[in-house]
Structures are given as structure tokens and as C-alpha cells.
């Protein structure tokens, strides 16, 4: 729906991945141009988080997010590390897991090209 074609290997990766996974696919579409990467690529995060999955299911739309820091600023590893100025600049913060101190696992990022090329961008 948000890319012209999903390579068959993407489904295998989604099923077999044991950690968060982001797939960078060709020909992103039906999203704001600011969401697209170079050459109109689209990065789709496959999440197992039950809250995110339920939000997407109920909204019937993808969620768009960014890092919890300003460009060039330090990357927070837990909610307490997010600056107050950033928190006050958003519309809503889910009242969940704010006391957690364990850093989340970064996603594996894999570039899947329509011609079959596969490139691991981040393990």
C-alpha cells in the first residue's frame, strides 16, 4: 500500500527477525514527501510492540515517528533522558513505560531493492 512492490524476501525477514526490523524499500508512495528518503525510498519499521500494533490496527494507518532528540543532540536511551523542551513541543505522550531505564534494542535496518539487491545498513 505504501510502496509499489514488496520483495518476497521481506516477508521472510519479517517472520524470522528476532529483534526490531526496519526495511528500506523502493518507490514509497501515498505518504507525505517529507517521509520519503533518497530516490523515493520508504523505511518501514516492523514492530512487535503490542501497543504500537494496536494503534496501527485501530487507526488503519501507519505511524510516522522520528528520534526523541533534536538534530545534533544526544540520543536519549530512556524517557527520563528526553529533554523537557522536546516533551513540551509534542501533542501527546503515551503514559506508558516512562519509568523504564533499560535502553531499547535498535532495529536492524535492511535495504531491499526492487531488483533483488539486499544491503544491511545496520545490524
PLM regions and their residue ranges:
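Active-site-adjacent structural elements in enzyme catalytic cores
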Residues: 1-123
Amino acid at each position: 500500500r505504501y510502496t509499489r512492490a514488496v520483495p518476497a524476501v521481506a516477508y521472510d525477514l519479517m517472520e524470522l527477525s528476532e529483534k526490531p526490523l526496519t526495511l528500506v524499500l523502493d518507490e514509497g508512495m501515498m505518504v507525505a514527501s517529507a517521509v520519503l528518503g533518497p530516490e523515493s525510498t520508504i523505511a518501514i519499521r516492523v514492530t512487535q510492540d503490542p501497543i504500537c500494533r494496536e494503534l496501527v490496527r485501530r487507526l488503519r494507518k501507519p505511524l510516522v515517528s522520528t528520534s526523541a532528540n533534536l538534530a545534533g543532540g544526544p540520543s536519549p536511551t530512556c524517557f527520563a533522558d528526553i529533554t523537557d523542551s522536546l516533551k513540551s513541543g509534542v501533542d501527546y505522550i503515551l503514559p506508558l513505560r516512562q519509568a523504564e531505564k533499560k535502553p531499547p534494542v535498535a532495529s536492524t535496518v535492511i535495504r531491499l531493492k526492487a531488483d533483488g539487491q539486499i544491503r544491511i545498513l545496520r545490524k
